[in-house]
Design a protein with these regions (language model features):
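Catalytic cores of DNA base-excision repair glycosylases
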Residues: 1-215
Length: 216
């Protein structure tokens, strides 16, 4: 959570190499349980393993705490995976949000990518900014408000692609302080579809959509 893909992927790969089946070469991979391995992990060693993700001391504590809960309540990572994929999505989301260290975006990503719940649209800072700036969601909508709009308007089968594409669009075009539209209509592929809420092209002033003055 709160880590870019560029930083999180190497950390994930290192974690799996040390604590997953790759890091347990003497053991049948079917017998390796990631939750049990993380629950028993040395915190300093785990922190060093995921250092590329940033905030590694805090995240290592969170991972161990979550792994301990999974083992205590479900018995194994596999059993928890079954819970995520087979139980009612609302119940799964509620359970995830009850876990300290898991926020709405992380919970929704688990539902979408691990649980196979196609109609879930995770909202990170990019998604929250883009769809209010576009005028798709109300300018004062919080993360949950934006999620509700997107899950209502976007076809379920497209939510996963739209989520990842939106993040890329936010990084390349619809940035927080200097969106591409300030360079002119040709600079942004969605220029003609966007209300540009909070963006003043004449002064180049950019504010959060919630702070923008909307003309009647």
């Amino acid at each position: 959570q709160n880590t870019s893909d560029v930083a999180s992927q190497p950390a994930h790969d290192a974690l799996m190499a040390r604590y997953g089946s790759e890091g347990n070469g003497d053991t049948d991979s079917a017998d390796v349980d990631l939750a049990a391995a993380l629950a028993a992990a040395d915190r300093a060693e785990l922190a060093d393993t995921i250092a590329s993700a940033g905030l590694y001391n805090q995240k290592s504590k969170t991972l161990i705490r979550l792994a301990e809960r999974v083992v205590a309540e479900y018995g194994s990572a596999a059993a928890f995976d079954s819970f995520v994929t087979e139980e009612d999505p609302a119940a799964v989301r509620s359970t995830l949000l009850d876990m300290k260290g898991v926020g709405p975006k992380t919970a929704d990503c688990v539902l979408l990518f691990s649980g196979g719940q196609a109609g879930v649209f995770p909202v990170d800072t990019h998604v929250h900014r883009i769809y209010r700036r576009l005028g798709v969601a109300p300018p004062d909508a919080d993360h949950e408000g934006v999620r509700e709009v997107l899950e209502r308007e976007v076809p379920a089968a497209k939510c996963g692609f739209a989520h990842t594409a939106s993040i890329q669009f936010g990084r390349e075009y619809c940035t927080a302080r200097k969106p591409a539209c300030l360079e002119g209509p040709e600079a942004c592929p969605l220029y003609d579809l966007c209300d540009r809420v909070g963006v003043d092209e004449e002064t180049s002033e950019v504010v959060d959509p919630a702070e923008a003055t909307v003309d009647d």
